[in-house]
Design a protein with these regions (language model features):
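Interaction modules related to DNA damage response and DNA replication/repair
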Residues: 209-308
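Short secondary-structure transition/capping segments
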Residues: 95-97, 118, 160-164, 201-203, ...
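Intrinsically disordered, low-complexity Ser/Thr-rich linker and spacer segments
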Residues: 104-110, 204, 305-307
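General N-terminal targeting signals
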Residues: 63, 103, 149, 189, ...
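Non-catalytic propeptide/linker segments at domain boundaries
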Residues: 193-207
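Amphipathic alpha-helical protein-interaction segments
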Residues: 2-194, 212-220, 256
Length: 308
């Protein structure tokens, strides 16, 4: 009789071995790269920062030492980086290779999940150089207009709503461009300039920057991996400040205020695991008029210090 295998998770709920859900994570990495390449290629020019971003994706990839497919991918990425330009032929060759790996490598593209991974990769690509040109905005609008199912759900619906407002008068001013860039970076977790990482940092959906939130009697829910200590340590801080710790965001709960604290490092699959689901739930409840706040780890640490 064969024993059923179980994934070994650390205390943050993250898999301790790469074998856990390997095919799904491999497909995610490939779909994300497809989106990144589309995003970077949108303006036909590879800037210095975009080159750094693409190289960071390659160097941070957890599969590169053991997987032949990723060795091939890395070689083609290096060819693209060599002259600083992504030509149409290079893009077609690269995208075809990535699609072949998905098709013939017995990998699932995830359906809707795969579409979102591609979108997040695209958002990372167009925001890698910390600017948005008209060509990139136009291509984003076209991408969102292609899939009604995609834009009916978070996070694409949030981008579509903001983009429609910006494009309503046919003019994108500097303020609107900056606003859209901030939203894109928040959703994709883009933090290359701050961290040097192509992925892995949390998307920041903070709903408040208020530095004086009284935690006494409040219900606090944590998600993500924290740079300032384990989740258990964060929960102990919350309890010491008179808050109630909740494991999930529950609609039926009689919530006055629930503070969802985002850890600074997210799971490889954050948008499809409890991390992303909790964010989606809170944003949905806020649209329904519920008084729920989301704060990031930086603000959480300031609150605990302040209230101590």
């Amino acid at each position: 009789m064969t024993a059923k295998s179980t994934a070994v998770l650390d205390h943050h709920g993250q898999p301790q071995t790469l074998a856990f859900n390997y095919k799904r994570n491999k497909a995610k990495a490939i779909l994300t790269l497809k989106g990144i390449l589309d995003g970077i290629h949108a303006d036909k020019h590879l800037s210095e920062l975009e080159e750094v971003y693409l190289r960071a994706w390659k160097d941070n990839d957890v599969f590169n030492l053991t997987d032949g497919d990723f060795i091939d991918i890395h070689e083609q990425v290096e060819d693209i980086l060599e002259d600083g330009v992504i030509t149409t032929s290079e893009l077609i060759d690269m995208q075809q290779m990535l699609q072949d790996i998905l098709n013939y490598g017995d990998l699932e593209d995830g359906g809707y999940e795969g579409t979102v991974n591609h979108l997040l990769g695209f958002l990372s690509g167009i925001s890698a150089d910390d600017t948005l040109c008209d060509a990139e905005i136009e291509k984003l609008a076209k991408l969102l207009s292609k899939d009604k199912h995609l834009v009916s759900k978070w996070p694409a619906n949030a981008i579509k709503k903001r983009l429609d407002m910006i494009l309503e008068d046919g003019i994108v001013d500097d303020s609107e461009r900056c606003d859209l860039l901030s939203l894109i970076k928040a959703i994709s977790g883009q933090s290359l300039l701050e961290t040097g990482l192509a992925y892995g940092m949390s998307a920041d959906f903070s709903t408040t920057q208020e530095g004086r939130i009284c935690l006494k009697g409040k219900q606090v829910c944590f998600t993500g991996k924290f740079l300032s200590g384990s989740r258990k340590i964060q929960e102990q801080k919350a309890l010491s400040l008179g808050a109630q710790v909740k494991g999930n965001v529950v609609k039926g709960l009689d919530i006055l205020v629930l503070v969802l604290v985002l850890g600074a490092v997210a799971s490889r699959d954050w948008q499809f695991t409890s991390y992303g689901r909790k964010i989606e739930s809170v944003l949905t409840y806020r649209e329904e008029g519920r008084k729920i706040e989301i704060i990031n780890e930086e603000l959480w640490n300031a609150l605990t210090v302040c209230d101590d």
